[in-house]
């Protein structure tokens, strides 16, 4: 049973519920610890936290940690994005690194934007190569512990295949980024967020990518990327089954100081 979730969002950014409601949902779902993550401020983007709301988020997470001590452990996380002007992060408990933008386009906004992104690069392979090169840049950020939704660019592929994910060129680009991130000690999340929001029936990353990660000796955690309290553990059974089918027998969980392996 999965007992921790380190990726969820609240009304401090683009979530539907308060931080306290997410903590209570996690407790009700049987989790022993919950990490609430904040989309880092990005100038001009209203789905992220603002520079003014960020300190209030940190204060609220401290309050919730104290209030629910002895019931559920509460961690304060940041989802960092490469588009942020920030080059360092305040003292969060942990940091997730993600890439939501490429070449001026939002990677995951909608299918029309995804298709326009591909067209702007002249085709899906060039777009994928650029995306994974961006992802690989996260390796240089020592504060980042977790790689968020590694193949987010495939969000709409179940509806209409946009990327040739089985091709050698696509996998070479993805594998190269994965290898750089793994070499830097990053943990990869299996992310079920697109399941709860109805875009996919399977988690990120693709099984072929997870099998490659396993061959490298890579580490994983399972997160819901929930934006609503009723999705706090959405898809966890599917994610665990996927991890096991790709050869993983343990998750890496945050203990307040560092990450440690926990067998399934």
What is the predicted role of each segment?
Residues 1-82, 87-89, 93, 154-156, ...:
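An N-terminally biased module of ancient metal coordination in phosphate/nucleic-acid-related enzymes
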Residues 27, 139-140, 214, 244:
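Non-catalytic positions within long, well-ordered alpha-helices that form the structural scaffold/packing
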Residues 34-36, 95, 147, 188, ...:
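Hydrophobic residues within beta-strands of alpha/beta enzymes
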Residues 48-183:
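Extended substrate/RNA-proximal surfaces in nucleic-acid metabolism proteins
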